[in-house]
From Swiss-Prot:
<dbReference type="GO" id="GO:0003735">
    <property type="term" value="F:structural constituent of ribosome"/>
</dbReference>
<dbReference type="GO" id="GO:0006412">
    <property type="term" value="P:translation"/>
</dbReference>
<dbReference type="Pfam" id="PF01247">
    <property type="entry name" value="Ribosomal_L35Ae"/>
</dbReference>
<dbReference type="InterPro" id="IPR009000">
    <property type="entry name" value="Transl_B-barrel_sf"/>
</dbReference>
<comment type="similarity">
    <text>Belongs to the eukaryotic ribosomal protein eL33 family.</text>
</comment>
<dbReference type="InterPro" id="IPR001780">
    <property type="entry name" value="Ribosomal_eL33"/>
</dbReference>
<dbReference type="InterPro" id="IPR018266">
    <property type="entry name" value="Ribosomal_eL33_CS"/>
</dbReference>
<protein>
    <recommendedName>
        <fullName>Large ribosomal subunit protein eL33</fullName>
    </recommendedName>
</protein>
<dbReference type="InterPro" id="IPR038661">
    <property type="entry name" value="Ribosomal_eL33_sf"/>
</dbReference>
<dbReference type="GO" id="GO:1990904">
    <property type="term" value="C:ribonucleoprotein complex"/>
</dbReference>
<keyword id="KW-0687">Ribonucleoprotein</keyword>
<keyword id="KW-0689">Ribosomal protein</keyword>
<dbReference type="GO" id="GO:0005840">
    <property type="term" value="C:ribosome"/>
</dbReference>
Length: 87
């Protein structure tokens, strides 16, 4: 089952930004319980040039269904607001 998701932000604090960990909101997932079923799944972002950057969902973020995904390499800023595919 493939799910689309939106890249919301980098994982960050007031002074630090972790560019290889992204906060992703899967579409039609609205609770922490539904999001926890996605842990361990593969996340793929396709760049405008056609490269595929792969990551893995590592944990839930918050109570509204967002998740954290750790990528092999950091995603560029142009990925923010873009769609990813959760496999």
């Amino acid at each position: 089952m493939r799910i689309k998701g939106v890249v919301l932000s980098y994982r960050r604090s007031k002074e630090n930004q972790h560019t290889n960990v992204m906060i992703i909101k899967p579409l039609n997932v609205n609770s922490r319980e539904e999001a926890s079923k996605l842990i361990g799944r593969l996340v793929i972002w396709k760049s405008p040039s056609g490269k595929l950057l792969k990551g893995k969902i590592v944990r839930v973020h918050g109570t509204k269904g967002a998740v954290r995904a750790r990528f092999e390499k950091g995603l560029p800023g142009q990925a923010l607001g873009d769609y990813v595919e959760i496999i």
